[in-house]
């Protein structure tokens, strides 16, 4: 398992992971919002600071996108959920941004326990996502190793 910086050629695999992970963990999205968010994400991801998790065969199995101290996105291929790739990506982000923050979906059942297990604490939230859609967010900030 290793981490490397993403390059433009990695974006298509990252989008594939995003789509698979979103389908597996964001069943609450309406079909219309899923299509809308997909288009927005596909337009945004090529400009993001992208970090990739690679398996033992050097295949990309997850990614994390950063914007300063903010973890903007973290998605792992559902086929390898629970194998430590997400944790490795977040720990890498914390080496670059020790005061990292993240906005996690309240409805994604695995997101909040995952971040809290790594030392993130709740600092607030909103009733909608950043585009005003009815998907509540929980704001978290890294408070140190639990």
What do these predicted regions represent?
Residues 70-81, 105:
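A short, internal acetyl-CoA/4′-phosphopantetheine-binding micro-motif in the GNAT/acyltransferase core
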Residues 87-88, 107-125, 131-134:
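Conserved active-site alpha-helix within GNAT-family acetyltransferase domains
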